[in-house]
């Protein structure tokens, strides 16, 4: 593309989980800003709704024509591969089963089930969720001989959307992976948060997103007497909900 007219094009890439860790340590700022001292949550929100989307639009044109990709995830240990090598690796990945690199994070409702099942650090206060198969936030490890290169897994979505998603899904959502897979752990922790997602028209007008979030839950494990203790799984809110009848809806069970 004309905007990338240069003798050599090198993309310095960074996994988004690593970017979040650097934001939490106040080492990096948002795109075009001098705000590295801001709250980590504010840095993340701006990254999610602005920075990543702006950069992904550039990446769509940049990835097919770059000469080299530079993995910058490990400070002081940069790893360089050619653009052709990257394209071949992602084309190969899109045609076979693969998985992304999961990450785990504490939270308000966090429990300790994943510590037992996944062998996680028991010194952490809790583990509220595991992000696994969320390409816009997880990363992908590519092996080249005895070297491993880490890239945002969303690079694969941007470069091979049809091969990865299929024609019908790509026609509806474009180069975006429209499903997020999370593990939520409340065992030994607290109640999940109340989530409110806007309708499609609102989220498109105010956040620039083309679809809203619908959710489906699978219970993988539970205490044997969970329902005897009166613990219920709420089925969500209904259009007829008002402040007056909220207690009534609060007792619905999925």
Question: Model features per residue range: what roles?
Answer:
Residues 1-32:
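ATP-dependent NMP and nucleoside kinases share a basic, alpha-helical "lid"
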Residues 2, 58-59, 207:
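Short, flexible, glycine/charge-rich loop motifs used to bind or transfer phosphoryl groups or to couple energy/partner
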Residues 25-87:
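Small-molecule kinase domains that catalyze NTP-dependent phosphoryl transfer to phosphate-bearing small molecules
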Residues 66-244:
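Transition-metal
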Residues 247:
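Active-site neighborhood of divalent metal-dependent phosphoester bond hydrolases
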Residues 250:
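A glycine-rich, Thr/Ser-enriched phosphate-binding loop motif common to dinucleotide/cofactor-binding enzymes
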Residues 253-254:
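Loop-centered beta-sheet repeat module
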């Amino acid at each position: 593309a004309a905007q990338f007219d240069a003798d050599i094009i090198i993309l310095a890439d960074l996994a988004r989980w690593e970017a979040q860790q650097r934001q939490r340590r106040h080492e990096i700022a948002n795109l075009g800003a001098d705000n590295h001292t801001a709250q980590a949550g504010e840095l993340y929100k701006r990254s999610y709704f602005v920075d990543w989307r702006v950069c992904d639009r550039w990446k769509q044109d940049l990835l097919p024509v770059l000469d080299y990709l530079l993995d910058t995830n490990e400070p002081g240990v940069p790893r360089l591969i050619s653009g052709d090598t990257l394209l071949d690796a992602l084309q190969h990945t899109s045609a076979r089963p693969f998985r992304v690199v999961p990450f785990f994070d504490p939270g308000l409702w966090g429990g300790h089930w994943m510590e037992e099942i996944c062998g996680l650090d028991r010194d952490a206060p809790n583990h509220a969720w595991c992000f696994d198969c969320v390409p816009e936030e997880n990363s992908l490890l590519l092996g080249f001989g005895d070297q491993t290169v880490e890239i945002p897994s969303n690079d694969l979505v941007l470069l091979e959307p049809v091969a990865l998603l299929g024609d019908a899904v790509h026609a509806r959502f474009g180069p975006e992976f429209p499903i997020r897979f999370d593990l939520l752990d409340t065992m030994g922790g607290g109640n999940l948060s109340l989530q409110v997602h806007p309708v499609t028209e609102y989220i498109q007008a105010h956040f620039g997103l083309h679809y809203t979030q619908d959710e489906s839950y699978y219970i993988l494990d539970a205490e044997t007497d969970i329902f005897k203790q009166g613990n219920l799984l709420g089925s969500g809110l209904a259009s007829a909900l008002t402040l007056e009848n909220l207690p009534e809806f609060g007792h619905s069970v999925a």
